[in-house]
From Swiss-Prot:
Family to which the UniProt record says this protein belongs: Belongs to the UPF0210 family.
HAMAP family the record matches: UPF0210 (MF_01221)
Domain of life: Bacteria
InterPro entries: UPF0210 (IPR007841)
The protein's name in its UniProt record: UPF0210 protein Athe_2116
Pfam families attached to this UniProt entry: DUF711
Record text on subunit structure and interactions: Homodimer.
Listed NCBIfam families: PRK05313.1 (NF003700)
Amino acid sequence: MFTSQEIIETINMVKQSNLDIRTITVGISLFDCSSDIPQRFIDNMRKKIIKYAGNLKNVANEIEDMFGLPIVNKRVALTPISLLTFSYSYEDLIEVALAIDEIAKELEVDLIGGYSAAVHKNYDENTKKFISSIPDALASTDRLCSSVDVGTTRSGINLDVIAHLGFIIKDIAQKTKDKDSFGCARFVVFANAPDDNPFMAGAFHGTGEGDCCINVGISGPGVVKRALEEKKDASIDEIYETIKKMAFKITRAGQLVLQYASKKLQIPAGIVDLSLAPTPKVGDSIAEILEEIGVEKVGGYGTTFALALLNDAVKKGGAMAASFTGGLSGAFIPVSEDSGMVKGVESGTLSLEKLEAMTSVCSVGLDMIVVPGDVEAEVISAMIADEIAIGVYNNKTTAVRVIPAYGKKEGDEVNFGGLLGGSKVMKINRSSPKRLIERGGRVPPPIISLRN
């Protein structure tokens, strides 16, 4: 049960500190929709998505009205489509992508994920065909999101697929060049991808998640920043404790929404993702929290330390506030979506290399990084390989969402609008990793995988 005091505190956090719920995501299994006939699969899928998510928008609006708590996005996550379309032609796959996008528009769902594949080991011809369809699938849709998992701590890293994905990302950028290569913002490459992630572009409904469930993603960097502003001369352990307490309060709001949405939609409750997700608004930034902790400018020395502290405190505080936690759970550092990170890029203190170091202690990885459009595909592949190695060898989720903005060079401006914000094109290291990437093959799992 939630006390009246908790509800009053939540209302105050909304009014004063930009607290919101980033997403209510309905996860739906499509295994019982599968068919060798693409149109039959599409028809079955449509019926099932409408059955479970048809009332999602109305319920989210009802929650906003009842609790005064903004629900920024309504989303749907599907069983990875690659598991259901082995026999489909390239053209069939694009038809499926278009159908999913149309369903999302009809239900007024902001984003729909699950055009996904897991390729930890063998890169077979069916999966290669599916991944090759991703550029056209994203170029011909508006709300569809796609992801590929290329490595796990238990299985190792698939360099063959990483090599291919450099060219795939370049192709997405070219095919969506009229929108500053926006298609790349709807595609992410993972290591150790979670099955219950409510956040896009990496959300999909895992095979062990049941027929349907609801997962909630919280937000609230502004709440943490406001609390830290009152702790100007506090010791670092007091700072840690303050973050932990604020994370507890933010997560309680997420748990409240999860329980209410589950009851109204008559769908089992899944998890609350304990992630602090920034927005382009000033005052709603992870970078500003790091600077409030004591870093002069994000990207300067001490940034990784401050981020590690923040990430751990958020997890510890949030874990006490929710019945079930999961997803990515930590602090997000998407450059274009965080006004403070954008300032760091513009001032030169925040580099790609520093961001990579930060990903070793935070929730995701190199996220919403805009790089020059003429970057070689092998450089993108090597960027992915570096980040995947951090995830696989440290037994954590990492990801890469990089935008090689077509026709743009270092220092140019790119603006995606909305939650995705905008950023200057970042400087990259131009040394060639081509010889490394062209070796191909698989990297065996690390010794820490032998845990039984």
